[in-house]
């Protein structure tokens, strides 16, 4: 199985998740930022984005839009990374990503992220300080990454791709 994991990231967590996912899907796997994808000649294309200010990165939605016709001919899965505080919104984010994706997405992975306000740029830091203040919560480093969840998703993708291949025979 030849897999491409295309993603964008602001501070590196989505790249970490992409690497873990590449290990989990096994077979030949390439990882690329959406801006650097040169080909979609893969059995499976997995597209990932962090969620910032209640939306996936525009670079990822633009990638889905720009490559929509080619992706309609591919097995596609999606994943996104978000702060655990936003759990109740996860289905909303999944649906938003699906709006840009082919209609027959194999699966959508939802993964907790890592958040450390000290590494943010000034604009993002102020945005997050305001966010925590509105929630009435005190800022702390949050690490909700879980490699086991990512590995399970990778195995699920392998299974779904095998099923998809069997149904076309």
Language-model regions, residue ranges each:
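N-terminal beta1-alpha1 ligand-phosphate binding loop
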Residues: 2-26
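Generic beta-sheet signal
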Residues: 3, 44-45
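Short active-site-proximal "capping" loops at secondary-structure junctions
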Residues: 36-37, 51-53
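Short acidic low-complexity segments
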Residues: 30-41
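FMN-binding flavodoxin-like domain, especially the glycine-rich phosphate-binding loop
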Residues: 24-28, 44, 53-169
């Amino acid at each position: 199985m030849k897999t491409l994991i295309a993603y964008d990231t602001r501070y590196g967590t989505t790249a970490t998740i992409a690497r873990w996912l590449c290990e989990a899907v096994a077979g030949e796997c390439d990882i690329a930022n959406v801006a650097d994808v040169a080909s979609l000649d893969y059995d499976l294309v997995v597209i990932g984005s962090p969620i910032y200010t209640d939306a996936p990165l525009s670079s990822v939605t633009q990638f889905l839009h720009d490559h929509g016709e080619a992706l309609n001919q591919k097995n596609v899965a999606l994943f996104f990374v978000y702060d655990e505080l936003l759990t109740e919104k996860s289905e909303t984010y999944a649906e938003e990503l699906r709006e840009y994706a082919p209609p027959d997405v194999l699966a959508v992975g939802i993964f907790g992220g890592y958040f450390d306000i000290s590494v943010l740029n000034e604009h993002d830091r102020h945005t997050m300080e305001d966010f925590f203040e509105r929630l009435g919560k005190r800022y702390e480093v949050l690490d909700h990454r879980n490699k086991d969840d990512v590995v399970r998703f990778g195995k699920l993708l392998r299974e779904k791709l095998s099923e998809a291949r069997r149904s076309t025979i």
